[in-house]
Amino acid sequence: MAGEGQRAEPEREGWALYVTPRAPLREGRPRLAPQNGGSGDVPAYGTPTPSRHGRREVRFSEEPPEVYGDFEPRAAKEKARVGRQIPLEGFRPDSAKEEVRESAYYLRSRQRRQPRLHEAEEMQTRRAALLQQQPHSPPPPLRPSPVTTRRGLRDSHSSEEDEPPSQTVLSQTVTKKAIRRTQETPVMSEDPLISLRRPPLRSSRSEAASVQQKVNFLEEGETEENDQDSFDSDVTVKVRSGDSVESGDQTTRSSSQYKESFWQSSQSGDFTAFDEQPLKLSSGYQKTPQEWAEKTVRIRTRMLTSSPGMRSIYGSFSDDDSVQKSELGNQSPSTSNQQMTGQPKSVSSVKTKRYWPFAVIAALLIGGFLYTRPPEAETTAVQEFQNQMKQLMNKYQGQDEKLWKRSQTFLEKHLNGSQSRPQPAILLLTAARDAEEALRCLSEQIADAYSSFRSVPAIRIDGASKATRDSDTVKEEVDQELSNGFRNGQNAAVVHRFESLPAGSTLIFYKYCDHESAAFKDVALVLTVLLEEETLGTSLGLKEIEEKVRDFLQVKFTNSDTPNSYKHMDPDKLSGLWSRISHLVLPVQPENDLKKGICL
């Protein structure tokens, strides 16, 4: 590549003036020299080989021609229809023509080209020769094109893979512990038009490698360091991360003791350098190596504060922070690094992180106070009911444990309902003849315990006193007593000798004991049934006792011998009534210490 001459462009005549020029053919790679030492038949680099004549050159489109290196606008072509046209290739320097050919090759062939070591050395040698031939006249700035931009991005990725991690540009070897000051390479200023180039193509590297960053460094207040440097200029630093910039005897190398992970994180800046520009400032003033060393230290510090990888460490810093530049202008790398690491975060973020735990705690306390605090009235009612039941347990010690446990749990659950109660609590107590007084006392005291919080006695209805009366009249009386009592604040009622009521009158309990449409749902009804047996065995289970009570009521309400019972009650109605009053059936045992007519 170093010794390749420039090809002469053929002149266009006749109809060729009106035809869009075809893109240059892809130049083949140089063949490897034979192993036996003979190299007479090895073609020069760039010579098309006959072995690849069958490959078809695929062009994406005939328009626009700018894609294939022809940057002449369409309007200029239409005006200059007559006359000899001079190709634009002639006005480009040799290095630009070479790049156009290579870029057209890369555009048609998407496969990444892996540069070799000897090719990189030849390119560096040719660039050094061009710089020596033109020391005082810099070449005109090239118009950036999509092709050259893609090539710059691709070469930056290739050079990152080829070069060892110990080599870097602009001394990116900065850690949190220390900054080693090394020799720095002067970085040239670029044409502002370069910043307007098209974004790079999608690459297989990480997203951080596709983001290009510009670091603007404004020279100001440097009269105390350099008496000659009295001008202000903006230096745009664009360095391709991973490429080595060689100028004279100045090189940039990193220490081998830094870790590989930090090297990869420093690559994410993806700075871009253009090798075609001489190492000069835009103002034409060239500094000594010592001045460049001091200048690059400040540039390096600015890049660290504005790079995406380090921005999360130092907080949020803007690239045009004048206070930051004035403080870092006269400091050494180590001093500036210590100052940067000690920089606090923004005031708003600190205040937010300081006060948000208190806000969360306050919200939790308020929510717990409003939603998790149980109602004080219901808690007190349950506690009062439990105290009353404990007293009854101490008085009536002859009762079975199942009576206390099941009745207390059943009524306490209904009393402690935090939501609206779906149905009333129905408790049915039964006993034999020997426990008639205990049945009466316990039923009344349990109902009073349920309503003890309201300090009102339970409603009492005696069915034995209404046995011989008309069923319709008894039905109206029972309905009136229950409805008036519940409306006046009483929430419990006890009905003694339920089996003695006229059969027709018991249908009123459909209204008060229904599962879904009960007239009062936040009340408790205690019903008692006195069996005809003399003694109720203690060995009977709850299921057997429930069946015994059901059979007894069926005989009592449907027997034709019973007055006023047959025409008002049938088995279907009795089954519906039984399903509503048999929520919980519990037996009551006799008490020896209980006297007739006096409860304990």
From Swiss-Prot:
Cross-link type Glycyl lysine isopeptide (Lys-Gly) (interchain with G-Cter in SUMO2), residue numbers: 325
What this protein is called in its record is Torsin-1A-interacting protein 1
Alphabetical GO CC annotations of the entry are:
nuclear inner membrane; nuclear membrane; nucleus
- Summarize the protein's role: Required for nuclear membrane integrity. Induces TOR1A and TOR1B ATPase activity and is required for their location on the nuclear membrane. Binds to A- and B-type lamins. Possible role in membrane attachment and assembly of the nuclear lamina.
Glycoprotein as a keyword of this entry, yes or no, is: yes
Phosphoserine PTM positions read 61, 137, 145, 156, 158-159, 189, 230, 233, 244, 322, 332
Give residues where Phosphothreonine occurs: 223
Record has Glycoprotein as a keyword: yes
Q: Which Gene3D superfamilies match?
A: 3.40.50.12190
Which coarse location class applies to the principal site listed for this UniProt protein? nucleus
Sorted alphabetically, the Gene Ontology BP terms of this entry are: nuclear membrane organization; positive regulation of ATP-dependent activity; protein localization to nucleus
Q: How does it sit in the membrane?
A: Single-pass membrane protein
Q: Which gene encodes it?
A: TOR1AIP1
**TM ranges:** 355-371
Instruction: Locate the coiled-coil region(s) and give their ranges.
Output: 376-452
Task: Give the compositionally biased regions (Polar residues).
Answer: 247-261, 325-346
Q: Which residues lie on this side of the membrane: Nuclear?
A: 1-354
**Which residue spans belong to the Perinuclear space compartment?**
372-600
Task: Supply the source organism for this entry.
Answer: Bos taurus
